[in-house]
Amino acid sequence: RMRLRDLRAKGQLKSLVITSPTPQDGKSTVSMNLATVLAESGRRQVLLVEADLHRPSLAKTLGIEAQPGLGECLEAGLDPMAAIRKIEPLNWYLLQAGQAQGNATELLQTASLPALMESLTSTFDWVIVDTPPVAPLTDALCVAKLVDAVLLVLRAGKTPQDVVHEALGLLGPGKVAGLIFNGADGLNKLYAKYAGYY
């Protein structure tokens, strides 16, 4: 969190992608936890965008009803402000993935996504985007181009080192603001060489 605050203080950070090299690394849980931490003060409006259109899970995790969201915004021109809901008592806002009928990857490559992201970042103090894993899909890369920074979530003892290296290479060192080691006590020695990457 301190790293994010430093970047924010320098005016370099307002929007984030949270992704992982492989599935089941805990990126969605990290996304929700980060949104909660950033919203704790109550003075900033935090939006979590569920951009995993392939396997949306946040509604079920939060125990709320699934409703139209990002997919419908991109596919049918739905006003995002009509789909965003406040998550109480966590004090942050959510734009669900929705249930669009089109190809998920193609939707994230549409020309309307940059304008949508610009609108959201001008409305909210923080915009956190939970995307699918970096490989084998290109979804995370499509969204990463439109945000200020990326946080990469690794599952200690599970995420293969070669896949981590590949994900970092695809995202680029200038885009990755940090690595989050999920399920680890301290920095796992297997991944220590990546600590200075960003």
What kind of region is each of these model predictions?
Residues R1-Y198:
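P-loop NTP-binding module
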